[in-house]
Amino acid sequence: MIITKKRVTEQKRTSHTARLFGLHFPMRLEPAVYGLTENMSEDYSGAYWDFWELSNGGVYMSPRSDERFNVSCMNYYAGEMSADALGITACLYAYSHLSFGKERQFTDTCIQQYHWLRDYALDHDEAGEIFRAVY
């Protein structure tokens, strides 16, 4: 089954993330994604982010940019990615890190989101780079 993505409109961003993550989105998930992105890429210096909804139930964010980013990760990956691939990578890292928390409902949501996003990333044009960065 092919997993597709659809941009979440400006009008629905807040309600969409609140429905999925509650207050954890603006307080924990969103800052984690931004911080991880800054740590992974010296080329990244802030951006407007698009929110994406996946046909399998997953969600992710990516910087709105046509630029490519040099990326290096703690697993010794070093390479170049599009903004979309960078966003997927940062969200996979964030979902993984946050899945070890104490609030069961939020951690379960992060676990499920990780798996849905990973499934989408398997067919991404930059799947090789994404998975070298994550694993």
Name each model feature, range by range:
Residues S72-T109:
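Compact, glycine/acidic-enriched structural inserts
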Residues F21, T37-S41, L92, S99, ...:
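Hydrophobic, Leu/Ile/Phe/Ala-enriched alpha-helical segments that form helix-helix packing faces
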Residues E10, E30-V33, A85, C110:
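A structural signal for well-ordered alpha-helical scaffolds and beta->alpha junctions
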Residues T14-R28:
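Extreme N-terminus nucleophile/cap motif
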Residues R7, T37-S41, M74-M81:
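Short, charged/polar micro-motifs that form catalytic or ligand-binding hotspots
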Residues I2-R13, G22, S99-Y135:
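Low-complexity intrinsically disordered segments
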Residues F25-R68:
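Amphipathic, interaction-prone secondary-structure segments
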